[in-house]
Regions:
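Bacterial N-terminal signal peptides
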Residues: 18-29
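Bacterial N-terminal signal peptides that target proteins for export
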Residues: 4-18
């Protein structure tokens, strides 16, 4: 059943997260929400938010975990893992895993595992959302236009208790692609 669309202004943030001895990649488009609008808090498919950022705007006390998201470019609400603690929250996970990443536009693995097992040994097996799903989360925003760039986070030690992070903009990228080793244009890296 198709959910009716709602209009909302959009604030965009690019994110990439690596969790639990893995490198994880995430990105999202973040529509601004009115503080009084609690109807789209992401707690159910009927209350799907347009982004993890909207979830955090509606509920500033939101914790990291699974939330329902739905943008005008998506055919139905879906659950995604939202990091609501890093830099004020609002980050959506689009990939995670330890080894075995693919550069396929179709992604890899069971997308439900991103929000069900974002960390720990269960997160070793790679899961990457399809490029179409990531583009739908961005809701028409190009990766190159994400003001915060891309955030990659990976476990620094085998126990997953210390983390290493790098951030960079992804330049001249009109649509999401997992083809990271090809001729990609990256901005400056910060650690």
């Amino acid at each position: 059943m198709k959910k009716p669309m709602r209009t909302t202004s959009h604030k965009t943030r690019w994110a990439s997260i690596a969790l639990a001895l893995s490198t994880v990649l995430t990105m999202s488009s973040f529509p601004a929400a009115s503080a009084a609008d609690t109807s789209h808090d992401g707690t159910s498919s009927d209350k799907a938010a347009a982004s993890c950022y909207e979830v955090k705007q509606v509920n500033p006390n939101a914790k990291s975990g699974a939330y329902w998201l739905y943008t005008p470019q998506m055919s139905a609400p879906q659950q995604f893992y939202c990091d609501q603690e890093t830099d004020g929250g609002g980050w959506v996970m689009v990939g995670r895993g330890r080894e075995g990443w693919t550069e396929s536009y179709g992604g890899v693995g069971n997308a439900d595992q991103l929000h069900k097992n974002p960390t720990g040994s269960a997160a070793f097996k790679p899961v990457q959302l399809s490029s179409n799903t990531v583009d739908a989360l961005l809701n028409g925003t190009k990766p190159q236009d994400l003001p915060d760039g891309m955030r990659l986070r990976r476990a620094y030690d085998p126990s997953g208790t210390q983390w290493q992070e790098v951030r960079t903009p992804r330049l001249q990228t009109a649509q999401w692609s997992w083809a990271m080793s090809y001729a990609q244009h990256w901005g400056p890296f910060t650690f």
